[in-house]
Amino acid sequence: KISTYKKLEKFNIPRPEYIIVDKSALLNLEINKMLKKHKEIVIKPSNSRGSRNVFIISGKTKGFKISDDTREITTDLEHFRNQFKKSLTKSYPLILMEKLREPAYDLDMLAWKGRPLRIIPRKRFNASVPNNGFVIVNNKDLIELGKKIISKFNLSWLYDCDIMYDLNNKPQILEINPRPS
């Protein structure tokens, strides 16, 4: 995930604002910095899959809530520090990023040698559960974004991007997966 975010940045392709934290001693400092700019942030291990060890720190939450559909935990800052921070000890480096808003989209892309053959945007019924259903949408902005990703990464074959929008209504790439979701 870290190398993908760095390449997205290099290619000027939108991705969430993020910080890499590679040791526990810096985590509180970086969380405080991100929370000053964003009211809600996401903390996730750079190498996890399927929402494992993903925390959403939100000022809108009192206590914590474990999602029924995923392993995601939404928590206030105090509960994160007192109850959950230690669970990430072996998960460094961590990605701290702005929390994006729902809905989530999958961008299915079929490409050959950096040329798009087919790009299909799908809007998820449930942002946290990609296989819980979707509707195909005709979103020209997402299709253009897919073309740029295919070209810049010189992709060949079938790929899936996870996309959500920021608070300024701009699409942000969360992941590029070499397979359909």
Task: Identify the meaning behind each predicted range.
Residues 30-33, 148-152:
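Amphipathic alpha-helical regulatory segments at dimerization interfaces
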Residues 15, 38, 91, 156-160:
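Short secondary-structure junction motifs
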Residues 109, 153-181:
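Conserved metal-phosphate-binding beta-hairpin within the catalytic cores
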Residues 68-132, 136-147, 164-172:
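Phosphate-binding site of ATP-dependent enzymes
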Residues 16-19, 42, 95-97, 160:
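Short catalytic-loop micro-motif centered on adjacent basic/acidic residues
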Residues 8, 34-59, 88-102, 119-122:
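ATP-grasp fold ATP-binding core
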Residues 15-18, 40-78, 106, 125-135:
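Glycine-rich phosphate-binding loop of ATP-grasp-fold ATP-dependent ligases
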Residues 1-33, 48-51:
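Conserved N-proximal alpha/beta basic substrate-recognition cap immediately N-terminal to
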